[in-house]
């Protein structure tokens, strides 16, 4: 068991100095076993080190110079490991200093190469076996290492292991324990007001179409509230108390600072009741009427006369305007002509593109198309629009009552269904007329309205 190191006291130093002086005065050599008997509790080794390292006069302290190293190497070659004679040959160092400096620095058998993992493992195993008895460990360590080198290497390995353990413990605690200020996040419903890009680029203020996006949890309640509000608005708009007419409420010409931006606000009530008495008697309002219900009282005009006259148009003021390059619906007969009695004239407007997708052929003409129930003037009761067997007529031309009417032949029987796609550009006034006419059909219509400037889509379900 290793002894506990104790500091030398002043009394112990006095006793050691007195014993050394007595031996020197009598001319006796310094026998440290005999001198240690004069200092209770101290060994011969303790007394020798204390004398030569601290109390002896003329002993050099600190690093060795090159001349001292050369004298030490020569003395060891001559006297071996007799450190007393080596110390006398050196003259500036005591025997302990000579022994320590030779074994730790100048011994040619010392290994100064890098430590390998196997050598580290052998050192740790030796410490487990011999504790910190570095003299015993150095005697059996391969390759040869000094006691100081073994001690320093063990201190380095222990410090490295402690740092790794602390780092792993810190990481484990950070994973297992959440931060003190940690709060679980919850989904919060927000009302986000969407502003179309047209407002930014055009600089005309708020856009008339505001889309309110809400969370899924509030959609059901909001739908009920919106239905109630729309029912109240429809009661005010009807005025006459007729519950069968579910006409849409359309606001046109929203403006900022008195400038009409051509936007449309549409409020539609989802109802299956037909809005027009002319169509109420039909069992299938969405089915197109057969050919027999359209009029055939117009004269034939060759197709070439329409295709070549790029400046001829038909002025239509109630529904919409068609311009050169439009597609219209007509029958395809062998003569290459269509039935029409429309008078047309030239006018200027913004080009549009209307594509009526159906099984019947298309001809490119410069005119407008109108579909509305015909009046009962000059007709018998059997052909009146309000009867079950007579659907409304299709008219091509202006809104005058004297305009000839043209029918479209080639359609199938009354029970057939058709899917019609229309692509057009219109103004606010034209949009109001279009929405009124479509709402009166009493069928489900999906309409996609885009803002022309920035292509911002808005879908309305009628």
Swiss-Prot record:
Keyword tags: DNA-binding, Nucleus, Repeat, Transcription, Transcription regulation
Pfam families: Myb_DNA-binding
DNA-binding region, residue range(s): 32-52, 83-106, 134-158
Matching InterPro entries: Homeodomain-like_sf, Myb_dom, MYB_TF, SANT/Myb
Basic and acidic residues: bias regions: 159-175
Predominant cellular place of this UniProt entry's protein: nucleus
UniProt biased composition (Acidic residues): 216-235
SUPFAM superfamilies per UniProt: Homeodomain-like
Positions of region (Disordered): 159-184, 216-262, 374-408
Cystines in this chain: none
Superkingdom classification of source: Eukaryota
Domain HTH myb-type: start-end pairs: 1-54, 56-110, 113-162
PANTHER family registered for this protein in UniProt: MYB PROTEIN-RELATED (PTHR45614), MYB-LIKE TRANSCRIPTION FACTOR (EUROFUNG)-RELATED (PTHR45614:SF199)
Function: Myb-like transcriptional regulator; part of the gene cluster that mediates the biosynthesis of the phthalide-terpenoid hybrid 11'-O-desmethylfendlerol.
Name of the featured protein: Myb-like transcriptional regulator mfmK
């Amino acid at each position: 068991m290793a002894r506990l190191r104790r500091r030398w006291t002043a009394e112990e130093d006095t006793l050691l100095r007195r014993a050394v002086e007595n031996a020197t005065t009598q001319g006796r050599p310094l026998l440290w076993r005999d001198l240690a008997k004069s200092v209770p509790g101290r060994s011969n080794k303790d007394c020798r080190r204390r004398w030569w390292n601290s109390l002896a006069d003329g002993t050099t302290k600190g690093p060795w110079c090159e001349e001292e190293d050369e004298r030490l190497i020569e003395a060891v070659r001559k006297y071996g490991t007799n450190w007393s004679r080596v110390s006398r040959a050196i003259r500036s160092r005591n025997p302990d200093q000579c022994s320590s400096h030779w074994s730790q620095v100048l011994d040619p058998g010392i290994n100064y190469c890098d430590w390998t993992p196997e050598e580290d493992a052998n050192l740790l195993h030796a410490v487990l076996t011999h504790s910190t008895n570095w003299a015993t460990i150095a005697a059996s360590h391969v390759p040869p290492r000094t006691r100081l080198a073994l001690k320093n290497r063990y201190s380095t390995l222990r410090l490295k292991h402690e740092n790794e353990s602390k780092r792993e413990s810190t990481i484990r605690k950070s994973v297992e324990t959440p931060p003190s200020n940690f709060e679980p996040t919850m989904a919060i419903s927000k009302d986000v007001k969407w502003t179309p890009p047209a407002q930014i680029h055009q600089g005309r203020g708020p856009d008339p179409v505001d889309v309110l996006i809400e969370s899924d949890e509030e959609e059901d309640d909001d739908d009920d509230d919106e239905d109630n509000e729309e029912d109240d608005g429809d009661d005010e708009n009807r005025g006459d108390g007729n519950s069968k007419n579910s006409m849409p409420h359309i606001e046109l010409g929203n403006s900022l600072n008195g400038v009409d931006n051509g936007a449309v606000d549409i409020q539609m009530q989802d109802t299956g009741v037909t809005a027009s008495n002319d169509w109420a008697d039909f069992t299938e309002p969405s089915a197109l009427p057969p050919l027999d219900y359209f009029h055939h009282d117009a004269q034939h005009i060759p197709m070439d006369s329409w295709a070549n006259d790029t400046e001829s148009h038909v002025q239509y003021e109630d529904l919409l305007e068609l311009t050169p390059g439009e597609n219209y619906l007509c029958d395809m007969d062998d003569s290459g002509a269509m039935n029409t009695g429309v008078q047309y004239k030239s006018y200027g407007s913004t080009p549009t593109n209307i594509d009526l997708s159906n099984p019947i052929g298309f001809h490119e003409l410069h005119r407008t198309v109108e579909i509305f129930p015909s009046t009962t003037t000059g007709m018998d009761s059997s052909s009146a629009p309000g009867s079950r067997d007579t659907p409304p007529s299709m008219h091509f031309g202006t809104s005058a009552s004297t305009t000839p009417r043209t029918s479209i032949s080639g359609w199938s029987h009354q029970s057939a269904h058709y899917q019609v796609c229309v692509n057009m550009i219109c103004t606010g006034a034209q949009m109001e007329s279009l929405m009124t006419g479509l709402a009166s059909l009493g069928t489900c219509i999906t309409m996609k309205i885009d803002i022309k400037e920035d292509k911002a889509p808005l879908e309305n379900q009628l």
